[in-house]
Amino acid sequence: VVLANDYGAYVHPDLPREAITTIKETLSVPVERGDLADVRTVGTAAVANDTGVLCHPKSREEELQAVEDALDVRADLGTINYGAPLVGSGLIAGNDGYVVGEDTTGPELGRIEETLGFID
């Protein structure tokens, strides 16, 4: 339902106004509504940290731009666990590292590390 980092939050488009206010006050970040690849539960469709956002591979360019604007980081497309598009279902990431499902392939790991800033 919520995709957030230290700079902003991107949330389910139908989230009630009261919930938006709670997120703004709790996280102290601006909040924008939207979806990714027609997935309204954006926290399932993407994973963010303070360096980047890995998004559902069918996310459209305008959706990526909206996420980049909301979270103030670069967004890219990717998958996990041998092609699963709902990256938030099997990837947890912070600024210091990540944990991903054991079926994730080498190329998928490379995309995760590049997008989320774990490659120097």
Over which residues does each language-model region extend?
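The feature marks the mature, well-folded catalytic cores of soluble enzymes
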Residues: V1-D120
